Amino acid sequence: MKRSSYILGLLAGFAALAVSCDLTENVQVKADKSMIFGSKSGLELYSNSFYKALPTLKNGFMQDKMCDVGAVSNTDTFIKQGAYNTETATSWSWGALKNINYFIDGCNDPKYCTVDAETRDNYLGIARWFRAWFYYDKLTTYGEVPWFPNNIQSYQNDVMYKDRDSRDVIIRNLIADLDFAYEHIQATSSTGSSTLTRWAAAAFKSRVCLFEAAYRR
């Protein structure tokens, strides 16, 4: 009898435990602004998300396959007449820019960004380098595109659907971003060549200027 009572007590305890545990509870994975912009580690972790925009080693080489660096067996779709139109083109995406501009706006907000100016500007430089990378791709693909210096909210339809800006506006802002990156990115070398240095800003600026000069010639 005592044993039966003991077993029943255990079962009742397990039942109560099962009722009190919410096995479907969602894990909170969203960090607030103070967690991101209030420390160097937060800035570093967020800025790591920008690097996925860079091409892989293979893609970096194959981007030049339309020139004489290697032999290919087919013509790239990019240069085929009529291959792209507004319905089939896949590069008119702005998600990466929203991610970057959110970070830039946060770094410039003293309410949340409480790190020292040198640390802040270092990560601002990294973000602005990637914004330049984003816009260089858009410029070489479409020419004139709208320039968005800040993060846009979903209700700002008048800003979201504004007209395209001129090449002069895009190039001026693009070079300003790269100049800022060169002046403020602290690293001059990278272990494993896996993160940006100030020399990446200088090298990328030379490519941007060469492309635009050749276009305007």
Q: Which sequence ranges carry the predicted segments?
A:
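Membrane-proximal, proline-rich intrinsically disordered regions
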Residues: 21-62
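Aromatic-lined, polymer-binding surfaces characteristic
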Residues: 148, 192-203
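TPR/Sel1-like alpha-solenoid repeat signature
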Residues: 128, 202-208
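Short, solvent-exposed turn/loop segments enriched in Gly/Ser/Thr/Pro and often Arg
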Residues: 60-73, 146, 195-197
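Bacterial Sec-dependent N-terminal signal peptides
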Residues: 1-28
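Short coil/turn linking the two alpha-helices of tandem helical-hairpin repeats
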Residues: 139-140, 146, 189, 211-216
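Conserved, well-structured interaction surfaces
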Residues: 35-45, 73-142, 157-172, 176-193
